[in-house]
Amino acid sequence: MTMLAAVGAALFLGAVMTAGDFIWAQFDVRHRMWTGMTHGALMCLCLGGVIGLRAERLSRGLMVGPLIGLLAAAAFYAMAPTFGYGAMLPAWMLFWICFALLQMWLTTGTPGAALGRGLIAAVLSGAAFYMISGIWTRPSPGGPNYVIHFIYWSFAFLPGFLALFVAHPTRHSQGV
């Protein structure tokens, strides 16, 4: 069931991110800080929803997810003047660590275990994220191929969800 949950979550976030790519391209959205912050908050609303749903604490996941998105986007914009688009990788890794802590808060576990899961998610998903980064650092001259985007985004999210979900309880054992 854990593998199925991780794959389902990765496919869902792959679809969300592909829809985001479509909106950016179709409506010629310019990359500005406010558009990036909005994008991060919406993406993490969905990711928080996945974590919250799995923990049977959907509303809490939906509330905290966008805050994590804003934090990760702010980290990106703080690092971007120095690292350019390279700042996306540490921001991506930061949000996995934050989502591991959210999962711990919503379920059971210790901060140390959550940080360990978050670091594993950050490194593995960060590597996958780096491997797909060409979809926007070297865009297709004919425009985005949304099937490829969906596959790539799903691939990038899968290691993170596996790290968070494998051998982790789905519910909090106490009242939260």
Please give the residue ranges for each predicted region:
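Juxtamembrane/disordered regions of integral membrane proteins
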Residues: M1-V176
